[in-house]
């Protein structure tokens, strides 16, 4: 057996080893219809049939509170060409103020839910709340995908074309990488 030296790593920072992670912008609306948008990297698909996605949010964030009251959200894929504008949506903007407007991002109506889709995003998953679980200091929010849309050319051979979309991946804090090449393994 081979011997290797490993350093201890703080358990409370374990999430910092699971990087980079896809970064999406989640759009919601409050009960008055005010638009909210925020970036999230604790995201994942959790079921193919039926299609279900999940992300984690601090329970006091506007996103989690809006979903709890309206039961709808949209996951918007973040391409590298809007990374600076995405970062604006991470700011602590007061409830009721539109983060998309503050970031200079455009939006359009969704097909099946009230929260809007971000025009600059190459893909969108419109979701209805399935369940929200308290997990430590976050809520795990699961949503049934009720509609999906992609920009023309954003999908190649049934997969997101990372070479053209250049999706944003979160390393930690304000550090990101861009997923812009594909490596095939055999």
From Swiss-Prot:
Record flagged with keyword Flavoprotein: yes
Keywords: Flavoprotein, FMN
Cofactor(s) essential for the protein: FMN
Keyword Lipid metabolism among record annotations: no
Source species, domain of life: Archaea
Stated family: Belongs to the flavoredoxin family.
Protein name per UniProt: Protein MTH_152
